[in-house]
UniProtKB/Swiss-Prot annotation:
Biological source species: Danio rerio (Zebrafish)
Name of the featured protein: Mitoferrin-1
Membrane topology: Multi-pass membrane protein
Compartments where located: Mitochondrion inner membrane
Annotated phenotype, changing residue 158 to W: In frs-tg180; induces embryonic hypochronic anemia
One of the GO biological process terms: iron import into the mitochondrion
Length: 332
């Protein structure tokens, strides 16, 4: 998920006078941080909540040695079987920890991205759009995002798996910390970064590229944010699926798969994960769940961008209105 802030001025296409102040993309300096964090938190929570059942399916489809009862051919077929055999709420298992992590993680993510992108764009292209600035800003923002989100990812994916032994969120956190130590919550952090840094770099560059073509004046146009976000999510999800498979293995520590690969103890490290995945399924194993991953990411990033841009626009316009009223009522 992600975003954009260029200093290109665009007045609203309404029957009101053209204003000379910055449009919503440029965000007034006094309000930008709070606006970005609020909009980012809301966008992140909605993104993960709306598409969570598909994310649960993706986690199961990436299992290297799935239970015969948990082998699925399609996302729809998987959801139908899970609901029929495990209950209506089963696809939502682990959603609570995801929401707890997504709010602060995305608040930091969007705020960091906007600040770094603006600073780098000023240096590289005098405030104009720069793909280098977009990629670097997205990568740096990812480091902060994943530091907050990684423990939530570990708990979430363990609760999503078929026949998960954990009764609740608290039970999962307690059992993992007792048996594997607190380090277990960050065992996949380096792999997460290895996956998410290229993911976000591709994601932001694709989004900005699409915006340049569909929304060159950087106005608030919801349809362009949805289209650009969906395209960015699909491309970045597809090219990073092999790394996501490795991350899932490190997060879940899938016992059957590790036993088949003769791995004793706990699997750690990207190199070991790559070797294990290849040993168990060859090259095709690196693309397990790619359909579910793309289906999940396309609407997720479209939701994240459209919600983020809406709240950024709404909050900025509200603050501008408050300032205008305050200025008019203040004594001269």
């Amino acid at each position: 998920m992600e975003l954009r802030t260029d200093a290109v001025l665009a007045s609203l296409e309404m029957s009101e006078p053209v204003k000379n102040d910055e449009d919503y993309e440029s965000l007034p300096a006094h309000a930008s941080l709070g606006t970005h964090m609020t909009a980012g938190a809301v966008a992140g929570i909605l993104e993960h909540t709306v598409m969570y059942p598909v994310d649960s399916v993706k986690t199961r489809m990436q299992s290297l040695q799935p239970d015969p009862k948990a082998q699925y051919r399609s996302v729809y077929g998987a959801l139908k079987r899970i609901v029929r055999t495990e209950g209506l709420l089963r696809p939502l298992r682990g959603l609570n920890i995801t929401v707890l992590g997504a709010g602060p993680a995305h608040a930091l993510y969007f705020a960091c991205y906007e600040r770094i992108k603006r600073s780098l764009s000023d240096v590289i292209q005098n405030g104009g759009n720069s793909h280098i600035a977009n990629g670097v800003a997205g990568s740096v923002a990812t480091v902060l995002h994943d530091a907050v989100m990684n423990p939530a990812e570990v708990v979430k994916q363990r609760m999503q798996m078929y026949n998960s032994p954990y009764r609740s969120l608290y039970d999962c956190v307690l059992m993992v910390s007792r048996k594997e130590g607190l380090a277990a919550f960050y065992r996949s952090y380096s792999t997460q970064l290895t996956m998410n840094i290229p993911f976000q770099a591709v994601h932001f560059i694709t989004y900005e590229f699409m915006q340049e073509h569909f929304n060159p004046h950087r106005q608030y146009r919801p349809e362009t944010h949805i289209i650009s976000g969906a395209a960015a999510g699909a491309v970045s999800a597809a090219v990073t699926t092999p790394l996501d498979v490795c991350k899932t293995l490190l997060n879940t520590q899938e016992n059957v798969a590790l036993s088949s690969a003769h791995v004793s103890g706990h699997l750690s490290g990207m190199v070991n994960a790559l070797r294990t995945v290849y040993r168990l399924g060859g090259v095709p194993a690196f693309f397990k769940g790619i359909q579910a991953r793309v289906i999940y990411q396309m609407p997720s990033t479209a939701i994240a961008w459209s919600v983020y841009e809406f709240f950024k626009y709404f909050l900025t316009q509200h603050e501008s209105h408050v300032q205008e009223v305050s200025h008019k009522t203040s004594p001269t």
